[in-house]
C-alpha cells in the first residue's frame, strides 16, 4: 500500500449547529457549506488538504446507508482519509487492510462527488478512509 498523503480530516458532529459555532464563528475557520448538506469544509486552511465538520447523521449515511449510527458500533469523533494514486489503489488497499484483519465498513466505491473511498473503523474509534479524490491529482 502506498499512501501519498493525508487527504482530509473531519470532526464528526452530533450537533452540527454547535460545531459550526465553534469552528466557524469562534475559531474563524473559512468553512463553506456543501449544497443540500450540513457538511462544512475548506480546502484553504494552511497545512491541510481538506478540513471538515461532518454531521454524524451524514457519516452514518455514508458508512451504513442510514442516518442513524448503529447502537452496537462505537460512535466516531473524527474521520481521517489517506490518499492513494488512483481508484484501483483504493480497492487494493482495502483488500490489504481486510487481509490484515481490519474489517471494512464498506468496500471501495465511488461517491456522488467523484471520490473513490473505502472506510473502516479504527481501534481508536475513528472513521479511516482510503481514498482517491481526482481534484487532488490535477496538475497545478
Report residues per predicted region:
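Short, flexible, mixed-charge acidic loops at enzyme active sites
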Residues: 56-71
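Short hydrophobic/aromatic beta-strand element in the GNAT-like acyltransferase core
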Residues: 40-41, 50, 81, 117-119
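Core segments of cupin and vicinal oxygen chelate
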Residues: 10-60
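N-terminal beta-strand motif that seeds the catalytic metal site of vicinal oxygen chelate
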Residues: 1-20, 77-82, 133-140
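Short connector loops at helix/strand junctions that flank enzyme active sites
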Residues: 4, 46-48, 73-77
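Vicinal oxygen chelate
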Residues: 2, 42, 94-140
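Mid-chain, well-packed structural core segment of small domains
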Residues: 74-94
